[in-house]
């Protein structure tokens, strides 16, 4: 199977850069520092108007754990309907029980809304209690792929687990490595694990055009980030990653 590179895109512009670099598809997210949250309908619509490659949208209403209230599930169902109406090809989600198991009721509701779309179970997988059992459940319920760092802080640290999951999957579901994948380690991951799907942001920082600055003021209150630069996917970095994967 051909190698696939999914770009975690934080904006419509990053989606454009991903396509220019030759990415297979994008996962469109807001709130990247929080692990990704659902982007606005406006961002989705603009992204769809700019690129032809598939767009998968994360369905995650907030940061934090993956145990959701009934109100949050209702919002997630609504977001899936919006994603479908805007012509996106797939959605990315995952709901857990308080014990770290597969939440049958919550996931079933989302799966029903997403019928006919591409389905990715996101890195909620990495904090589940029994990953090998969870993998079988995802296969049985119809997910097309699972995004995972191998239940480790980064995919490189979890490469042995990723390889084991890929062996267990045996082509029944895609195993897509994500978290900390860079130009310097993507080949190592590919050769060590045997997987063919990779998820990376491949971003660089774009300096702000603001000339007047008040750098001591942060919009995040207690969470301090650089307000005068923004991360954006680099078409050149994507192209380099594609070339590396094609050479394996």
Swiss-Prot record:
* An annotated Gene Ontology molecular function: copper ion binding
Q: Does the keyword Cytoplasm apply?
A: yes
Report the locations given in the UniProt record. Answer: Cytoplasm
Provide a GO CC annotation, any one.
cytoplasm
**The organism's place on the tree of life at top rank:** Bacteria
Entry annotated with the keyword Repeat:
no
SUPFAM superfamilies, per database record? CutC-like
Disulfide-bond pairs as recorded: none
Which InterPro entries would you find in this protein's record?
Answer: CutC-like (IPR005627), CutC-like_dom_sf (IPR036822)
Q: Pfam families given for it? A: CutC
Which keywords does this Swiss-Prot/TrEMBL entry list? Cytoplasm
Q: Which family does it belong to?
A: Belongs to the CutC family.
Q: Which HAMAP family match?
A: CutC
PANTHER family cross-referenced by the UniProt entry: COPPER HOMEOSTASIS PROTEIN CUTC, COPPER HOMEOSTASIS PROTEIN CUTC HOMOLOG
Q: What is this protein called?
A: PF03932 family protein CutC
Species source reads Porphyromonas gingivalis (strain ATCC 33277 / DSM 20709 / CIP 103683 / JCM 12257 / NCTC 11834 / 2561)
Read off the lineage from the record: Bacteria, Pseudomonadati, Bacteroidota, Bacteroidia, Bacteroidales
